[in-house]
Amino acid sequence: MTLAARPPFEEPLGRGRARLLPWATVMVGSLVTILPWSATLPLLPPAGLLILLSWRLLAPLSLRVWAPALLGLFDDLLSGQPLGSAMLLWTLAFFLVEAIDARSGVRDFKQSWAIAAIAIGFVLVGGRLVATPLDAHVDSVLLLQIVISVLLFPAAARLVAWIDLRRAL
C-alpha cells in the first residue's frame, strides 16, 4: 500500500507505537518457544533471534544498541536457558553485525543472509556451550538446528520487511 492508496481517514501509526513495534515483534518471536510443539529433537529455530537480526539488518535504526540485552533477558525467562545467556549472546551477535556492517558499507540480501548465518551460528553454538555439558552428544542436532535457522531467516526477514512497511505507512 502506497501513501496515495491509503484510505483518506486512516490514522497513521503513532510515533510511540511505531517504536514499540520492533520490540513487540521480537518478543512475540521469543514467545514461539512456549507453544506446545511435538518433536523428538530440539530443532525449533530461535524465532526471537531471527526477528531481532532481521530488524537489525533491514532497519538498522529501529532498535537501539542496548536492546538485545533486554530482549535476550525476555527470551531467557521464556526459553529456560541459563539466565543471561541470550542477553550476552544476542548482544555480542548484535555487536558482530554492527562491526561487519561498519566495514562492509552497502550490501545486498545475500550478504545480509551470510551475516545473519554467522550470527545465528555464533549464538546457537554459544548457547550449546553455556547450557549443556561438553560431553553431551548434541552437535549433529545443533548443526541441523543451525541449518534450519539459517534457511528460515529469509522468511523472518520478509515478515519484518512487511511489518516495517506497514509501520511506515
Question: Model regions: which residues?
Answer:
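Terminal, non-globular segments
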Residues: 1-169
